[in-house]
């Protein structure tokens, strides 16, 4: 099991998205109150997008000072910037285009046809450099200590674009290019476990019965090379936020909190 992971189960995907949104707002407000700014790493996927839409629709959305927030992505599809496959595009449509973010603090990963000359390795290196430039001495590493790092969960246990037994699962750099990805599109850029584990809090968010086996394996002692989600651990806190379907295969003895 991911060391110290907390498991919270909500009734269905809709309630899960709203609960994640409420947690995001509360955590960002608390971080800004304590240190003036905050940082958030976004994920793609259906439940990730639903959570961002729920943030936008929340009555408390303006409690966050969006101009004092650094926004990152855990992974990105290396396609044209206007492609519907881009996690960035989905996040902008769901939330970022509807709140007053500071464009200089929105750190999108590179895209095909952009300044990296269609080279995902160059895009990965440039993102790693950007991460390092934003790290402070008190972060004790080449990556900022993110307040929240959101991750989806693949049915085979992948997080970000780190797939089981893939080169990215063994990567020691903070950001890596991914080629021949088993899930389209095949070329991507991803934060590695080195970067993920630098976050203060890592939240794995999953809905649907097709995620149940992956959640069970990750929370029952699987290795992070075989089940990358097992290595998604925050420095201070690791949260697994699931709907009942995604939690349906968890072992009976696993501690969890269930909402009505």
Residue ranges and their predicted role:
Residues 60-70, 99-101, 168-169, 194-199, ...:
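Short, conserved loop/helix-junction motifs that constitute active-site signature segments
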Residues 29-59:
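Glycine-rich N-terminal segment of FAD-binding domains in flavoprotein oxidoreductases
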Residues 194, 200-260:
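ATP/nucleoside-binding phosphotransfer catalytic cores, i.e., glycine-rich phosphate-binding loops
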Residues 54-65, 89, 93, 164-173:
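A glycine- and small-aliphatic-rich helix-loop capping segment at beta-alpha/alpha-beta transitions
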Residues 148-194:
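Class I SAM-dependent methyltransferase SAM-binding "motif I" and its flanking Rossmann-like core
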Residues 1-40, 121:
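N-terminal glycine-/serine-/threonine-rich phosphate-binding loop
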Residues 2-4, 64-147:
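Ligand-binding beta-strand-loop-alpha-helix segment within the catalytic cores
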Residues 42-47, 151-155, 207:
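Glycine-rich beta-strand-to-loop/alpha-helix junction loops that act as flexible
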